[in-house]
């Protein structure tokens, strides 16, 4: 984590992310479809069911097929479910105020709610790294934070100090093949998708106005290079073919987790 912090501080102080520094293989999005859903605020792809977990800031989170048909729903002891992610073989949900709880995918409670360390957090999106760290994005104050599995703070970054400021971060996903962090910034910010390396270097930014307004959630299906972005305005989820930023000359990425039902 010290290496991560040094890399981030280096980006902030030296402004390393310039057009000349970007690799030849840059972030690329190509829209493949869209469907309507009621206020999709947070997304997570589940390869076990070949579907999406969706939180919409209410008391219930739902699992839907990739066509938008509901498969099941879960509730928690939190006042609402603002963000959702998969942690191992279960779910981790957040209320948006720093509270979290673990549930089975059948909705059984695995433990009481717990709070993230470090004071109040306007948690908009959550993801779990390969090493078990909980990564959150917050928009008031504007932060990207790393916690251990129990909620202890490890590292926190002010995203306003990035070479390209991230002012209204909402959703976060991690590409398991690269470790890259994919974060959407809503329309009060830049209405963009940001891509960070696993070490915290800002790799790319893609404007999303061509596809929708007010992005809130993001999920990745690495087995098919598919990305899902939820837009609040219009209440739609847009699907994309997705190519991550890679160093020049890199071999194509191997497939990641895909549908286990087929």
Predicted regions and their residues:
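Bacterial N-terminal signal peptides that target proteins for export
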Residues: 1-12
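A short beta-strand motif characteristic of beta-propeller blades
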Residues: 27-35, 69-75, 109-117, 153-164, ...
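Beta-rich, blade/repeat-based domains predominating
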Residues: 35-49, 77-88, 97, 117-133, ...
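Conserved beta-strand positions in repeat-built beta-propeller and related beta-rich domains
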Residues: 36, 45-47, 52-58, 92-98, ...
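Beta-propeller domains
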Residues: 55-67
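A short loop-to-beta-strand structural motif that recurs across blades of beta-propeller domains
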Residues: 60-62, 99-102, 143-146, 192-194, ...
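Short loop/turn segments that connect beta-strands within beta-propeller blades
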Residues: 65-69, 104-108, 148-152, 196-201, ...
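Blade-level signature of beta-propeller repeat domains, shared across WD40, Kelch, NHL, RCC1
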Residues: 216-260
